[in-house]
UniProtKB/Swiss-Prot annotation:
This is Lysine--tRNA ligase. The modification Phosphothreonine is found at residue 620. The lineage of its organism: Eukaryota, Metazoa, Chordata, Craniata, Vertebrata. It comes from Rattus norvegicus. The modification N6-acetyllysine is found at residues 117, 170. Residues 611-626 have a biased composition (Low complexity).
């Protein structure tokens, strides 16, 4: 009977306990008395005693868990209650809240906002009319004298709270920031529309909140320009604990993944993107004045053309076919020149399925233009005028200082004073290597490829397969010529084997009328006199197709539509392209391309620990895009 009663007791306990909970308890109880020991061959009294021990242990364990849970909840409730009390009775500063764990802070802040909604207050109003920007306010009233208070002028401003300081219960200071400037809000109960509302609004506001302020311009006795509010409105509460400006936001992973937070806390980031915008604006204005027409071309193409690069592939459901993301807009531009639009340009995104490193991002911005009745000599002059004028317009000088290894590394002076240095690729390579290369007319032979291969091996210059002549030359140029280019330098007259879209050199057989502009060892521009012979163009496309078949993923496809367009006649034309991102890096002294992209490509956080970074070399031939 006792055994049956015990079994009923156990079954009752099982009914009250979920199987998941029972499984956990069984595992823990098994350490005291495993169920496998409760065997029928033991005497009944032993089995009864063992079962009692187990039930007693299970009960103690359950009581212990309940106490721990109750204690944790009690501590959290006490913390929440204390913080909630501070939220309404701490002179509005909320300093104690900022000692909390960020998760607790978020919970408390969310509850406070929910309470506002329940009470009928809208913490997210639809509209707040702003009379004057913070920048304009500072410009117009900075002349005030200490102690001035213009009670006859009432203005409305808005911004984000970055600091909150109480000087007693009736005087609270806020640092309001926006547009890269700071304005102090001097909230005094005497000037507010009512004492009760003064207390209420200041108890609500926290660092990070976006607020609207209606008040009078003034200056404190210490000379701090301020707005003295008659009324303040919560426009959008910040639910997260905002890092203090004193410490800033320095972690790069957080900065790149949460760019909005980076912009809130780091004004230098805002300045970089202002400079980026100025660069694009200057280029547009420069080309517009030369009579160029800005155009837009497709970003998804049946054939990826215009550059030697590996494309991204997507799929079009309706057409039931693969499409390629644009690697360069060049071929479309030249078709438009065939159609009679003699000067065209486009500023836009390109996509290349290649490596991510300090100077490469799979999605990047370029400017390309094509100019009928011009050659690469004309484009060198235009490049010098554009870049030197841009640098001087934005920085005030032709010379800039750049830190390629970061702020703590060595500083270099880059001089954009025209004219820029010019070197011929093959001649300079022979000079630096101290060897005589085969005649450029023989660069397409296997003998030349073997000579270049041997030079790379002897000089320990790495070149992953396929070790084609074009790739070997590109590696040698990168190793021995590009590294000498600190101030702007044109590397000119590339071999035809490296430039399937460029026109052959009018004086040097085997070469093309092409140049690349390097600054601080990095390519920023690429341009050439365009090949407009449809027969020769088709031959070069076929050679590229052979290279692709041999394993070169970056080799070009044959574009029949483009070849057909050339058959209608492309006038003598020169084409040019520049990487906006790299130019921005130099003018903002940034050594990482992620610093000048608002939302750079990043590995998913759960993969960043295990994924290995890959580095892909720059293309040996681009459209004039880089």
């Amino acid at each position: 009977m006792l055994m049956q009663a015990a079994v009923r007791l156990v079954r009752g306990s099982l009914r009250q306990t979920s199987w998941a909970e029972w499984g956990q308890r069984e595992l823990r109880l098994g350490q005291l008395a495993p169920f496998t020991t409760l065997r029928k061959d033991k005497p009944l009294s032993d089995r009864r005693s063992e079962l009692k021990r187990r039930l007693k242990a299970e009960k103690k364990l359950a009581e212990k868990e309940a106490k721990q849970k109750e204690l944790s909840e009690k501590q959290l409730n006490q913390t929440t209650a204390a913080a909630a009390t501070n939220h309404t009775a701490d002179n509005g500063v909320g300093a104690e809240e900022e000692t909390l764990d960020p998760n607790q802070y978020y919970k408390i802040r969310s509850q406070a906002v929910q309470q506002l909604k329940v009470s009928g207050e809208d913490p997210y109003p639809h509209k707040f009319h702003v009379d004057i920007s913070l920048t304009q306010f500072i410009q117009e009233y900075s002349h005030l004298q200490p102690g001035d208070h213009l009670t006859d002028i009432t203005l409305k401003v808005a911004g984000r709270i970055h600091a909150k300081r109480a000087s007693g219960g009736k005087l609270i200071f806020y640092d309001l920031r926006g547009e890269g400037v700071k304005l102090q809000v001097m909230a005094n109960s005497r000037n507010y529309k009512s004492e009760e509302e003064f207390v209420h609004i200041n108890n609500k506001l926290r660092r990070g909140d976006i607020i609207g302020v209606e008040g009078n311009p003034g200056k404190t006795k210490k000379g701090e320009l301020s707005i003295v509010p008659r009324e303040m409105t919560l426009l959008s509460p910040c639910l997260h604990m905002l890092p203090h400006l004193h410490f800033g936001l320095k972690d790069k992973e957080t900065r790149y993944r949460q760019r909005y937070l980076d912009l809130i806390l780091n004004d230098f980031v805002r300045q970089k993107f202002i400079i980026r915008s100025k660069i694009i604006t200057y280029i547009r204005s420069f080309l517009d004045e030369l009579g160029f027409l800005e155009i837009e071309t497709p970003m998804m193409n049946i054939i990826p053309g215009g550059a030697v690069a590996k494309p991204f592939i997507t799929y079009h459901n309706e057409l039931d076919m693969n499409l390629y993301m644009r690697i360069a807009p060049e071929l479309y531009h030249k078709m438009l020149v065939v159609g009679g639009i003699d000067r065209v340009y486009e500023i836009g995104r390109q996509f290349r399925n290649e490596g991510i490193d300090l100077t490469h991002n799979p999605e990047f911005t370029t400017c390309e233009f094509y100019m009928a009745y011009a050659d690469y000599h004309d484009l060198m002059e235009i490049t010098e005028k554009m870049l030197s004028g841009m640098v001087r317009s934005i920085t005030g000088s032709y010379k800039i200082t750049y830190h390629p290894d970061g702020p703590e590394g060595q500083a270099y002076e880059i001089d954009f004073t025209p004219p820029f240095r010019r070197i011929s690729m093959v001649e300079e390579l022979e000079k630096v290597l101290g060897v005589k290369l085969p005649e450029t007319s023989l660069f397409e032979t296997e003998e030349t490829r073997k000579i270049l291969d041997d030079i790379c091996v002897a000089r320990a210059v790495e070149c992953p397969p396929p070790r084609t002549t074009a790739r070997l030359l590109d590696k040698l140029v990168g190793e021995f010529l590009e590294v000498t280019c600190i101030s702007p330098t044109f590397i000119c007259d590339h071999p035809q084997i490296m430039s399937p879209l460029a026109k052959w050199h009018r004086c040097k057989e085997g070469l093309t009328e092409r140049f690349e502009l390097f600054v601080m060892k990095k390519e920023i521009c690429n341009a050439y006199t365009e090949l407009n012979d449809p027969v020769r163009q088709r031959q070069l496309f076929e050679e590229q197709a052979k290279a692709k078949a041999a394993g070169d993923d970056e080799a070009m496809f044959i574009d029949e539509n483009f070849c057909t367009a050339l058959e209608y006649g492309l006038p003598p034309t020169a084409g040019w392209g520049m990487g906006i991102d790299r130019v921005t890096m130099f003018l903002t002294d940034s050594n990482n391309i992620k610093e000048v992209l608002l939302f750079p490509a990043m590995k998913p956080e759960d993969k960043k620990e295990t994924a290995t970074a890959t580095e892909t070399p720059e293309s040996t031939e681009a459209s004039p895009s880089v």
